[in-house]
């Protein structure tokens, strides 16, 4: 209450911040006549002048006012659009590294140009992040006109580009691309072996469009690059032949309850002998560093034979091992056990051993975007998540006033008892709206729910069409011109592509009915009457005669204007029956415009607000209403069964709805609870992610330092000395007598790792020799050995070998370390049962693993360099084959499973050789690529359906 009073007296913090921008807005407006009087050349020259000022010591804040005035004038001359005052404020918020919340249709894309231009003047590159390739290409071409006019370069990063094309795009002043592409390029860059191969040039400033979607909804979605391990089928089969030779009584112990198998001391000796005889043992001991993967696969083979039973845990069919679900008993084709277990089962059953994959690199969006020196974002709905955005990213959400007041009517929810009653009510509402040609967008929470609604419409005489199909749209246009409902509808789900943007843009045509899942077509405005630009682009593409084209454009313009008027007039007038003895009936008019119908509330208020926000752009009229049932997920979570009992007692009849503002408030409180819980989960998971992220940054930064150094001789020398120090300390304890030294063990290790046969026993027998003297002699011999190699092969060749071995070994051990961290993450929660904090335990264990990684790196690099034999024309180290993965947090589906997002994209020459009429010339086509037949459809929706 006191807070509300204070806000009335002094304004909210948001109001005060908006007010603080007004002096600079006034200054920009005052400059407008002066800038407008400049010639194109003089306006373009201001970019050079601004850069000179920055070079002389001026800050970006110092030149903000003239820079914004320059961009506004350039936009007027190139696009015919002028930034409103509220858009100038939005640009300032973005420049300050915060989030500008701007309602649908307020011109977020244009707003970004202000902050993008200003920050690009610094010369460090600006990244604009979009949610899909279509928007990246659209916005870079559209807004690129402004930047090009002002003498700046613009690049775009989309799927399928070569490394050279990517590097050129990142080298531009401004780069547009998707969050996926930026993240994968970062991961790939940190797997390259030279700086010249890297495509990104740093992370100075990024503006994230639809920031709530990327930084919250997809925050925990990891981007993963995996690669197949070498074909080791022979190795698995060899290991499998050892198992019958082991004695269960003496060689291993099985714990069926814990589902573990452990080798005994006797078993280890038996396995060592078998491995040595088969030529599979590296070094002397099974547990040497080189044999880590061998031990792992032996354990997996033991598990396959001892814990997994054929026809209970799996079946064998068509040369495949197929897992059986332990709960349902159903086969799960396509599912595979990880970490080599499935390969061990295949070897056990003597079927073809399929290759396994290994995670080569991964990062979450949370950790990727926090690398930027300055991060900003735009969205229509972020205020409800303001706490999380500030807590995790230190981004404040600033609500930007609309240029024109919102005229949308948001009605109270209608709550029904069952799903069937709810869908019947939605159908009736859609039919009423369609009868007056009011366009309707029905929002659903899932593809499954959208199909249910589609079936309801089909069963009631409606026909499903594709709004991207010109013939289907012409039926809709013809019906609208005749003033009759066409009874046509389209269904969209969240798979972004150009056709989808067109469908969404046409959802404002009179009589259009569109069923869409949450994110479908986000980033594309729904204009009343349809999109003039989209229609001109699609309907004139095949017209070559200029006069015919101009005539067609005029017809389209007349169509869109007439359609807009029809939609604006699609109001609903309702007569309210008077109470007994009252005055005659009153009428209630509900506005026309786009009618948003929500088929259920989502866990997040923000998603509901996004749906409502599709209507009422730039002061247009519109309506929104949610239809709910007590069987909806959110209602069930919060005790709809008790409410159902109460409504039954109150005599609520079938088909009747409850409508009351209290219901809305109760639902909002329920949503707030779910949001708070989800925030806590994300925050807790981030704490775990931070541990591996800190280690990733150390490794990646170290890699770049190594690549920057002309020579890593000093680094490998230090590693060799530290390794020898640790080795001597292990066998020659400090302050111990010479008789207590493990001289034989030290000699053996020096021979095994360094390949040096040193007279350690003789040195140890010398009178008065101390451990320091022993250490010094060993280091000197090791240094002499390396100096001899340098003399033999030459400094240049040796420097190359040192860097190659160091980088390749680091990469190999880092990948193994990632696997270990994954294993640790999966089991660390069990420590909670022992009254230990899993997070602290994870930090401690992960640190120990990281220390072990560094120690293994020293040993492995030292061992390889001491034994290295260089051949002439040493080949450049090659990166392993890679595949990119991004798992949908809702479905668990790999969104990139069928996309060709490998390190080396498809060769442009191969694509150029494709004949649209001859599928045999197409080669391998990614399922999400455009179909080579030039239909405009994705391959998976065209010829790929039959592949």
Curated annotation (Swiss-Prot):
Gene3D superfamilies: Helical scaffold and wing domains of SecA, P-loop containing nucleotide triphosphate hydrolases, SecA, preprotein cross-linking domain. InterPro entries: Helicase_ATP-bd (IPR014001), P-loop_NTPase (IPR027417), SEC_C_motif (IPR004027), SecA (IPR000185), SecA_CS (IPR020937), SecA_DEAD (IPR011115), SecA_motor_DEAD (IPR014018), SecA_preprotein_X-link_dom (IPR011130). GO terms for molecular function: ATP binding; metal ion binding; protein-exporting ATPase activity. GO terms for cellular component: cell envelope Sec protein transport complex; cytosol; plasma membrane. Transmembrane segments: none annotated. Its cofactor is Zn(2+). Its main location: membrane. One of its GO terms (biological process) is protein targeting. Pfam families: P-loop_SecA, SEC-C, SecA_DEAD, SecA_PP_bind, SecA_SW. May bind 1 zinc ion per subunit. Residues 908-918 have a biased composition (Basic and acidic residues). It is found in: Cell inner membrane; Cytoplasm. Zn(2+) binds at residues 931, 933, 942-943. Its EC number is 7.4.2.8. Monomer and homodimer. Part of the essential Sec protein translocation apparatus which comprises SecA, SecYEG and auxiliary proteins SecDF-YajC and YidC. This is Protein translocase subunit SecA 1. It comes from Rhodopseudomonas palustris (strain BisA53).
